[in-house]
Amino acid sequence: MQSGNFTLEVIMYLINSILAFIMIFFTFVNPSLLKCQYWTYILVALITAIIFHTGSKVGKSSG
């Protein structure tokens, strides 16, 4: 079961990373998107999820 759980974590990490990259790209192309409150909330949430996931993986591997 551990292997399946790891696979799901990797898939979710990749999806979050791809979505965050696309949203950051669109933000550079059209900076007026930052005026949209929900766009900013979603972008911050995706980046936060990536940071927490990375920290969780580092914590699991060190201990």
Curated annotation (Swiss-Prot):
Gene Ontology, cellular component aspect: host cell membrane; membrane
Keywords, in A-Z order: Host membrane, Membrane, Transmembrane, Transmembrane helix
Topological domains annotated Extracellular: 1-8, 53-63
Membrane topology: Multi-pass membrane protein
Location of this chain's protein in the cell: Host membrane
Record has Magnesium as a keyword: no
Topology feature Cytoplasmic, residues: 30-31
Transmembrane helix in keyword set: yes
Membrane-crossing segments per the record: 9-29, 32-52
Protein name: Putative transmembrane protein ORF63
Organism lineage string: Viruses, Adnaviria, Zilligvirae, Taleaviricota, Tokiviricetes
